[in-house]
Amino acid sequence: MNKTILFLLLGVSLSAVAQTDALKAKISKSADKIEGQVIAWRRDFHEHPELGNNEVRTAGIVANYLKSLGLEVKTGVGKTGVVGILKGAKPGPVVALRADMDGLPVVERTPLAFASKVKSTFNGQSVGVMHACGHDSHTAMLMGVAQVLSSLKNELKGTVKFIFQPAEEGPPFGEEGGAELMIKEGVMENPHVDVAFGLHINSQTPVGTITYRPGGTMASVNDMRIIVKGRQAHGAYPWSSVDPVVVSAQIINALQTVVSRNLNVTEPNPAFTISEWTVYSDATNNLISHPNSPKIAPNDFNPNLR
């Protein structure tokens, strides 16, 4: 297990534990000891990914392991979320460590021995499921941190709340989920969280390197759908139709000018992107469809721009 990443995760609790060379050596030894287990967890989660609000298997493995460590465990938080509470032997702050658990509706095309072959349904369509964003690693890493900190319970000043979040990529369309629902259901209370930390792996960052910056580090994402209603006709008689596919194409092109011609780059955090993920129509190949639905994903660091 990469010690730099482990120390980052443990650092929030090292503020509550005497920061001595002996303690750091103990943590390093513990990290080495559980490296194989963390890798095994990660590969298992990678092979068995689950979509947002459906992380039943993953949540079960997490909850059972936290219970085996003697933690107070709450399940079903924000639908499939898991929360573990570790109370140190000494008084101190409440620190939350958070990892996400959900996979993505993506077909895995890798030669890995533990590649996902999972199929599921997403927004009414049959899809492959893959941990394409590293949440398998996040979950396994936080389980490892829970084990290390549990072994330091007698030296711990304060409480650590381990939050395993579902639906970080967003819940299915029309459903609640993710961090917002967990907060609504009280995940930051009982006990009240004084400070919370999370991280995200990044394949573009060299191994052993941690990157950070003031303010937002990763952009938010929004889910938007546009329904274009036309008039259906046979493809041989396009003049009898109002073709929503052609209209959708013009909308998609025009959306690019939202950023290039309407964004004030002198404002704070001007970074903003708009990506068109899918265009869906239910017509056969010889019909001009009636409804057509482009799916749009704006990304930003500034809610005012959104």
Features from the language model and the residues they span:
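Histidine/acidic-residue-rich, glycine-tolerant segments that coordinate divalent metal ions
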Residues: K119-M130, D136-S137, V148, N154-E267, ...
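Acidic/His- and Gly-rich active-site-bordering loop/insert found
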Residues: Q19-M130, A140-G144, V148-G158
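Active-site beta-loop-alpha junctions enriched in small/polar residues
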Residues: E50, D100-D102, A167-E169, N202, ...
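Positively charged n-region of N-terminal signal peptides that target proteins for export
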Residues: M1-I5
